[in-house]
Amino acid sequence: MEAETARAGSQRVSNRSILVLCLVFFCAMIGMAYAAVPLYSLFCRVTGYNGTTQRVEQYSDVILDKTINVTFDANTSNGLNWDFRPVDKMVKPKIGETIKVTFKATNRSPVATTGTAVFNVTPMEAGAYFNKVECFCFTETTLQPGETLEMPVVFFVDPDIATARETKSVHTLTLSYTFYPAKTEKPVASLPVKTESGDSKL
C-alpha cells in the first residue's frame, strides 16, 4: 500500500514537471516568434537579403561612367483604396549618381486613411547596393479623402555593384513598393456613423 502511494506521488510530481516544461517551452516559442520579425528585418537591412534596400544619410562620392536601368513598380493591398503609381516608369542614372524620383498616391475612399509602404529590389542580390537617402517608406503616410500626394525617393546605386561577382552582370534593377493599411489605423467599421438626427454614434 505504501509502495503504491509512493508511486502515485512520484507520478504526480512527474506530471507536474512535464506540465511546467511544456509551459516554459510554449512561452519561449511565443517570445521567439515576436523577436523573429524585428531580428529578420534588421538582418535584411544590414545584408540586403531578400532584396531589402539600404538606408544611408549621405550621397555617394564616386560616380562611374556607366549607367544602369532602374524601373519602378507600385502596388496597393486590397485594404487600401488608393491609386499609387510612379511618375516615371524608368530612369537611367550613372552608377553612384544620386537622383530623385517621384511617386503619386490618391486616396479614393470617403475617409482619411493611413498607409505604410514595404519595398524591395530585384534581382534580390542587388538589394544591398541600392541606397536610399530619402523615402516616403521611412514613415507612415496619411491621405485625406480625394487627396493626391507627391512622394519623393532619393537614391543612388552603390558603385560596388559593378565589380561584385554576384551583380557585375546586372544591367536593370526594379524597385517595388506595396502600400498596406497602417496597423494604427482605426477600422472603418468603428468610425462614427451619423444618425438621421445628425448625431454621431459608434
From Swiss-Prot:
Identify the main location: membrane
Example GO biological process: respiratory chain complex IV assembly
**Cytoplasmic compartment residues:** 1-16
Q: Which molecular function term from Gene Ontology is one that the record holds?
A: copper ion binding
Task: List the Periplasmic topological domains.
Answer: 40-202
Q: Which GO terms describe its cellular component?
A: plasma membrane
Q: Where in the cell is it found?
A: Cell inner membrane
> How does the protein associate with the membrane?
Single-pass type II membrane protein
Tell me the disulfide pairings in this chain.
Answer: none
Q: Where are the transmembrane segments?
A: 17-39
Tell me the superkingdom of the source.
Answer: Bacteria
Which key words are in the record? Answer: Cell inner membrane, Cell membrane, Copper, Membrane, Signal-anchor, Transmembrane, Transmembrane helix
One family from Pfam that matches here is CtaG_Cox11
- HAMAP family, per the entry: CtaG
The UniProt family comment states: Belongs to the COX11/CtaG family.
Describe its function: Exerts its effect at some terminal stage of cytochrome c oxidase synthesis, probably by being involved in the insertion of the copper B into subunit I.
Q: What is this protein called?
A: Cytochrome c oxidase assembly protein CtaG
Look up and give the organism this protein is from. Answer: Agrobacterium fabrum (strain C58 / ATCC 33970) (Agrobacterium tumefaciens (strain C58))
Its taxonomic placement starts with:
Bacteria, Pseudomonadati, Pseudomonadota, Alphaproteobacteria, Hyphomicrobiales
